[in-house]
Amino acid sequence: MKSKTKTRRKAREYAVQALYSWQISKNDIYDVINHFKKNKTINEIDQIYFYELIIGITKNLKYLDELMRPYLSRTIQELGQIEKAILRISFFELDKRYDIPFKVTINESIELAKLFGAKDSHKFINGVLDKASLKLRKNNSNKN
């Protein structure tokens, strides 16, 4: 049996890919999820967490984009699609999942950027999340 850490990491990887596909194609998110269920080894991931990320992000998209806006050096529209997907996952975790330490969210996001992003996107992601995590988790410290 795989560890929760590994299956959750894989769920984040799949979530980046699913969000990227959704952002590019504009297909219904449930169609994207069904495509992943057919074409990926979905049993090797934390499926519940994958669904929570995808559904939670798409249902709270405007809120999450607005939440990240003050920490960006450019507009959301100017972000690359991969960076946008990673940041949406990160801000979802920072805002909704207080059981996940913010340092874990930052580390996982950096690793996702190294895996999927442009050459230096991990540095951009790290800078955004360093600023945001201090503010977001401080403002919600009663939830930590």
Swiss-Prot record:
GO molecular function per UniProt: RNA binding
Protein keywords: RNA-binding, Transcription, Transcription antitermination, Transcription regulation
Organism lineage: Bacteria, Pseudomonadati, Pseudomonadota, Gammaproteobacteria, Enterobacterales
TM region(s), chain numbering: none
GO cellular component: cytosol
InterPro entries: NusB-like_sf, NusB_fam, NusB_RsmB_TIM44
Gene that this sequence comes from: nusB
PANTHER family: ANTITERMINATION NUSB DOMAIN-CONTAINING PROTEIN (PTHR11078:SF3), N UTILIZATION SUBSTANCE PROTEIN B-RELATED (PTHR11078)
Family membership: Belongs to the NusB family.
Protein name: Transcription antitermination protein NusB
